[in-house]
From Swiss-Prot:
N6-carboxylysine modified-residue sites: 98
InterPro entries for the chain: Amidohydro-rel, DHOdimr, Dihydroorotase_CS, Metal_Hydrolase
Family named by the database record: Belongs to the metallo-dependent hydrolases superfamily. DHOase family. Class II DHOase subfamily.
Catalytic activity, EC: 3.5.2.3
Gene: pyrC
Name assigned to this protein: Dihydroorotase
GO cellular component, one term: cytosol
């Protein structure tokens, strides 16, 4: 097969950032995705309906001329989030709330310290038909960074899913066989997003033969056995797993430093890279479900009607992109060949 046409996909997890960065990031995503779930970890974070609506307006203003792209807005849970905050968010059209354990990733310092205190908020999300999106890692310093996803499942995820049985939960950017197995065995209303980097790479690609900061993300890349579990589950076509790039831009100097930031800026190549993975797996027939159907169905949103076509054609991801402020950013897979291209 040298050409594949699918329903236009959506990205169910990404980071746009803010201000002039939006002129770069929104265009990159809008080129091939109709909708995207926008993470709220700005500085300060998007914690209220009012802040979410303001952020949405800034995103819409950054769309390329003629674009029909629509952001799906979220709010950021903190220890101070109230049931009223959830009700206000629902009225404002916000579809989901994102839970970051405090300190788990970029701009998560305002995140949750006392998860137990948030159960009334989780109940309010369920009562209002909103989703809970979870960065599923513990943050205790004594727990090895490669084990933090599994520990979160054992310490928290099982309880959340069991104690609020009518709450829709998305286990974001899963990276381990443990997470795959958990989601497969979980009740209805539990799903997961998977990034291109966790399908394409393992920790050797970040650490073997030199440190590659542009492959550094959180949750961190894991060993190859976990990568293979992710690849196998997307190959299976399970509707519990769908596309979420976690595209996360940082200027080059913030990645290439003595304390580099976590995140892969994949928006310019993500759809093509997912296609390459499904091609490698002999499962191109499963791409449309993963990219275009399962996420919309899980969120209770209509499937897109427009279509996109990808062709088997090699191209090279640029080594650098210039941001609107003049600074360079290194895109994910920079300087490498991709075997599929958006038509």
């Amino acid at each position: 097969m040298n050409e594949i046409t699918i329903i236009k996909p959506d990205d169910w997890h990404l980071h746009f950032r803010d201000q002039d960065m939006l002129l770069e990031t929104v265009a990159a995503t809008a080129r091939c995705f109709e909708r995207a779930v926008v993470m709220p970890n700005l500085v300060p974070p998007v914690t209220t309906a009012e802040l979410a609506l303001s952020y949405k307006e800034r995103i819409l203003a950054a769309r390329p001329a003629g674009s029909t792209f629509m952001p799906v807005m979220t709010i950021y849970l903190t220890d101070k989030t109230s049931v009223q905050d959830i009700q206000d968010a629902k009225k404002a059209g916000v579809l989901a709330a994102k839970m970051y354990p405090a300190g788990a990733t970029t701009n998560s310092d305002s995140g949750v310290n006392s998860l137990e205190s948030l159960y009334p908020v989780f109940e309010a999300l369920a009562d209002n038909g909103m989703l809970l999106l979870i960065h599923g890692e513990v943050t205790q310093k004594h727990i090895d960074i490669f084990d933090r996803e599994k520990e979160f499942i054992d310490q928290h995820m099982v309880n959340i899913v069991d104690r609020v049985p009518n709450l829709k939960v998305v286990f974001e950017h899963i990276t381990t066989k443990d997470a795959v197995d958990f989601v497969l065995a979980a009740r209805d209303g539990v799903a997961a997003t998977i990034t291109p980097q966790h399908l394409l790479l393992n920790r050797n690609d970040m650490l073997d033969g030199g440190v590659r900061p542009h492959n550094y993300c959180l949750p961190v890349l894991k060993r190859s056995t976990h990568q293979q579990a992710l690849r196998e589950v997307v190959k299976s076509g399970s509707p519990k797993f769908f596309l979420g790039t976690d595209s996360a831009p940082h200027a080059k100097h913030r990645k290439e430093s003595d304390c580099g930031c976590a995140g892969c800026y994949s928006a310019w190549s993500a759809l093509e890279l997912y296609t390459q993975v499904f091609d490698e797996l002999g499962a191109l027939d499963k791409l449309e479900g993963f990219a275009s159907l399962y996420g919309a169905d899980f969120y209770g949103l209509p499937r897109n009607t427009e279509k996109v076509t990808l062709v088997r054609e090699s191209w090279e991801v640029p080594n650098s992109i210039t941001l609107p402020n003049g600074e360079p950013i290194v895109p994910f897979f920079a300087g490498k060949q991709i075997s599929w291209k958006l038509k």
